[in-house]
């Protein structure tokens, strides 16, 4: 019985084993089919990503091609423009100019209306070309330049005429040969006398007012000038002929002038100047190259006087404000000659105070007070008065001027100005100087 049971169990297992294997195979087939389906879906997703990436790549390639084409066209245009500029420069270069090719032309001027009291310059009211100057600045070779100035009209001229202003060769930064940068440069020719500061801003476009100070010390003369800068210090010194003739010097003695400047910071400037005109021939030179009081230094001696001279010293200060400036200067002068009969030596003093302030962005106001104290012997001081009357007539003992002005700056190259100046003084004979007040309106320009 037991043997039969065992035999039956064995027979059952032998029959069921293949069936179990077949069931396992069916399960494996079903799992494989599911994996294949998932792989197909992933493949489709990857293909879609590749298609999108290919589209992006094609768009980027198109943009790169456009940029490259634009860059090529831009380069072509730049090359063409550079070629045109070279051709234009070659055409514009003056014939026979063998320098570096750097040449600049410019002009400055002022036109307006001037009227004064009966004893002034303009008793009838004059429309006038107040200033007109032409400039030429050219590079000769490296660090050597030429500068020339032609005056067609000036405040001091009685008519429109051609006169030579500055003209010099500038040997720049000679100190570089010794390893010192900008310590020494040299000008040779016809230059402004380096005395004081006002002359550097007396042109119509640079002067915030229309009038100048009463002393108005300035001059152009032939000679040699040395200038440079060391740290916060600057200097200029010149040896010049000293007399008014432009083509001759009638005395071996020369004019010597110099200025030492100091800039401790960006808003403060200080300077000290000194000058001697040197001995001037009373008949040959006749007048100094240096202007003073809208006139000159001239001989004040008698018939036996053959030589005369003047010595001067001045201190200047400028305070640069965010919306304006303050300027002041004061000085001393001494005149002497070799008159064998009389002692004509005399000392005098002068000063000026100036303030300029922006009212609005382009509108500004300015005021200047100046005075000359010439002492009991007096000096020939013209001021706003008639030249013939006050330069060759009775000498002036003291005189003052108050100038009030407004200006509108359309740009740094175009300024409209108006000013009223009060001026009074006394002559050595006790008479008063009056009726010299002046009104002026002017348009100053530069290009």
Segments from the language model and where they lie:
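Outer membrane beta-barrel
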Residues: 92-244, 250-276, 354-375
């Amino acid at each position: 019985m037991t043997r039969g049971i065992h035999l039956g169990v064995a027979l059952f297992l032998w029959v069921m084993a293949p069936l179990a294997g077949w069931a396992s195979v069916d399960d494996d087939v079903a799992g494989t089919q599911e994996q294949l389906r998932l792989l197909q879906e992933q493949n489709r997703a990857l293909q879609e990503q590749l298609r999108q990436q290919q589209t992006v790549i094609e768009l980027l390639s198109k943009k790169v091609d456009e940029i490259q084409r634009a860059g090529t066209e831009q380069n072509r245009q730049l090359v063409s423009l550079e070629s045109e500029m070279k051709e234009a420069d070659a055409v514009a270069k003056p014939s026979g100019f063998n320098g570096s090719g750097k040449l600049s032309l410019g002009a400055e001027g002022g036109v307006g209306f001037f009227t004064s009291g009966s004893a002034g310059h303009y008793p009838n009211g004059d429309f006038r070309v107040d200033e007109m100057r032409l400039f030429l600045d050219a590079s000769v070779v490296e660090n050597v330049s030429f500068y020339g100035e032609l005056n067609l009209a000036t405040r001091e001229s009685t008519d429109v005429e051609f006169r030579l202003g500055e003209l010099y060769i500038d040997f720049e930064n000679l100190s570089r040969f010794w390893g010192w940068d900008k310590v020494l440069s040299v000008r040779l020719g016809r230059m402004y006398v380096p005395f004081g500061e006002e002359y550097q801003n007396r042109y119509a476009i640079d002067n915030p007012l229309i009038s100048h100070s009463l002393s108005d010390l300035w001059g152009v003369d032939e000679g040699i000038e040395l200038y440079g800068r060391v740290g916060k210090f600057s200097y200029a010194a010149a040896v010049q002929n000293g007399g008014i003739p432009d083509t001759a010097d009638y005395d071996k003695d020369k004019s010597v002038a110099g200025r030492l400047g100091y800039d401790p910071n960006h808003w403060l400037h200080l300077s000290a100047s000194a000058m001697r005109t040197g001995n001037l021939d009373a008949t040959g030179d006749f007048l100094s190259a240096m202007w003073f009081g809208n006139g000159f230094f001239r001989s004040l001696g008698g018939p036996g006087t053959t030589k005369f001279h003047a010595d001067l010293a001045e201190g200047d200060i400028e305070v640069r404000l965010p919306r304006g400036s303050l300027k002041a200067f004061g000085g001393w002068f001494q005149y002497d000659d070799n008159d064998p009969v009389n002692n004509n030596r005399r000392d005098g003093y002068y000063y000026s105070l100036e303030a300029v302030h922006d009212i609005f962005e382009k509108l500004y106001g300015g005021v200047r007070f100046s005075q000359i104290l010439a002492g009991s012997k007096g000096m020939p001081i013209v001021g706003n008065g008639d030249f013939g009357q006050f330069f060759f007539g009775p000498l002036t003992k003291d005189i003052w001027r108050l100038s009030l002005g407004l200006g509108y700056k359309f740009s740094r190259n175009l300024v409209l100005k108006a000013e009223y100046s009060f001026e009074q003084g006394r002559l050595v004979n006790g008479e008063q100087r009056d009726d010299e007040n002046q009104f002026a309106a002017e348009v100053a320009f530069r290009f």
